[in-house]
């Protein structure tokens, strides 16, 4: 399920030390108990949840590939006609392998996996990686999606700056979605994304991802950006696919060939 390209650095987190399962999760990811930590990890209904302690009214963050919005998108989201599918080159007879170099909560990776791609998620934040692994655990156990999830989705813990170079495998597409400051004040930004951004911070080194991504990808690199953001590392893409609020910048290295 999970590989690590680096030893996880110790990160402070609050959790109930009377629960051995929580203790084991935190030990695995190098998360040390800190009674003054801003964030708390809890288990709710067999699900690892991250709460922001100074904003108890906010809904906790967790990874759920089985139900909710992600499952709805899998069933009704437009299939291979979605912008992200077009961006990575999914088409008749072409199902590329993908490295998601900035996995986050795994939603885009899951969409691509549900459309047939083998996806390796790379996540450097140990708290987010713990949430992802827990989401994968529950997805792998699900009778509906478990079989293909086990085949198509895996997690690598490490910084993409080094992990992309260390993967040592051939991959068609590298997908990047660096954290970028939101300027609008939507409900999503106010709640879930605000919590997430306060945990992981801005990807200040995001420009440094393009070169290793281009070195690893055999076919193309796809960068998801807000519509108002500048090009990653100032490099103009070969083409763009635009949506209502975002765009996918596509850097082409070679043509996609049918299987």
From Swiss-Prot:
Signal peptide: none annotated. S-adenosyl-L-methionine binds at residues 107-108, 123-124, 159-160, 177. SUPFAM superfamilies: S-adenosyl-L-methionine-dependent methyltransferases (SSF53335). CDD domains: AdoMet_MTases. Its main location: cytoplasm. Keywords: Cytoplasm, Methyltransferase, rRNA processing, S-adenosyl-L-methionine, Transferase. It is found in: Cytoplasm. It is an enzyme of class 2 (transferase). Its EC number is 2.1.1.242. It catalyses: guanosine(1516) in 16S rRNA + S-adenosyl-L-methionine = N(2)-methylguanosine(1516) in 16S rRNA + S-adenosyl-L-homocysteine + H(+). GO terms for molecular function: rRNA (guanine-N2-)-methyltransferase activity. GO terms for cellular component: cytoplasm. Pfam families: SAM_MT. Specifically methylates the guanosine in position 1516 of 16S rRNA. Belongs to the methyltransferase superfamily. RsmJ family. HAMAP family: 16SrRNA_methyltr_J. This is Ribosomal RNA small subunit methyltransferase J. It comes from Shewanella loihica (strain ATCC BAA-1088 / PV-4). The lineage of its organism: Bacteria, Pseudomonadati, Pseudomonadota, Gammaproteobacteria, Alteromonadales.
